[in-house]
Amino acid sequence: MSRLLVLKSSILGDYSQSNKLVDEFINHFDHQQLVVRDLAQQPLPVLDFQVATALRAAGELTAEQQAIVTLSDTLIDEIKEADTLVIAAPMYNFTIPTQLKNWIDLIARAGVTFTYTEQGPKGLIEGKKAVIVTTRGGIHKDAASDIITPYLKTVLGFVGITEVEFVYAEALNMGDDFANKGLASASEHLAALTA
């Protein structure tokens, strides 16, 4: 049995292929606890001056700053309580959705999820796995245009999550035959992860 934290970031709601694939995965995954956070339906604040200063503030906080820190703490606690993160990360203009980036900006906190040492940065969230389901209109895996894979590997590794599995559903806008093959390939990969 496992505890899952599911992050959906597609703006397409019920039309989202990444959400459908993630739902398929969690329906077949043996889990005892499930937390689903739809970052498009319940958007998080954008990293701006107010958010950045709140997350770096020392000492007295304003009510607004405290609310931001409390939200960040909640998001981090969700990660700490999970064994596996399942992240739906569709490709929008070669990168992740803004909604997912907002989540990253709130959980990447010096002294909380990572620290700087004499040997360099060290992630403080350990013993977690991540499954990234990424959908794309074209074919980008292993190409220079795939910015998502190295970015998410880097940022998750930076906070200590180094066991990361990517599931690709590609060619979804290249006609029905390509789309069906891309979705079938992703479904097979997800099924293998639940076996």
Swiss-Prot record:
Keyword field: Flavoprotein, FMN, NAD, Oxidoreductase
Subunit structure of this chain's protein: Homodimer.
Residues involved in FMN binding: 10, 16-18, 91-94, 135-138
Protein name: FMN-dependent NADH:quinone oxidoreductase
Keyword NAD attributed: yes
Record lineage: Bacteria, Pseudomonadati, Pseudomonadota, Gammaproteobacteria, Vibrionales
InterPro entries assigned to the protein according to its UniProt record, in alphabetical order: Flavodoxin_fold (IPR003680), Flavoprotein-like_sf (IPR029039), FMN-dep_NADH:Q_OxRdtase_AzoR1 (IPR050104), NADH:quinone_OxRdtase_FMN_depd (IPR023048)
Superkingdom in the source lineage: Bacteria
